[in-house]
Regions:
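Long, basic/Gly/Ser/Thr-rich N-terminal segments
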Residues: 1-90
Length: 91
């Protein structure tokens, strides 16, 4: 069972043919997402990074990777200059 956290990619993610146990829409802080899912069992989390408040600040992604099992997270990146830059992707 999978979890979807969506914002800008909501329409694309809603078309996936997967089992979903929880779906969260909107913008949340990294701390809110960690608190929401740290004791929640799921196979994979599909995370639209635009759902993370101030996602351009890499420390917010680091908070999520430290607070949740990063091996279970699939990131959906927007097609913009910042998130597709090599410096952003290398961090």
């Amino acid at each position: 069972m999978n979890v979807i956290v969506a914002n800008e990619a909501k329409s694309m993610l809603s078309e996936l043919d997967i089992d979903i146990i929880k779906s969260v829409d909107g913008v949340h802080t990294a701390d809110e997402l960690v608190d929401m899912f740290k004791n929640f069992f799921y196979a994979r989390m599909i995370l639209d990074i635009t759902a993370i408040e101030n996602y351009n600040d890499i420390t917010n992604l680091q908070k999520i990777s430290m607070g949740l099992d990063a091996d279970k997270i699939i990131l959906v990146l927007p097609n913009n200059e910042i998130s597709t830059s090599s410096s952003y992707l290398s961090k």
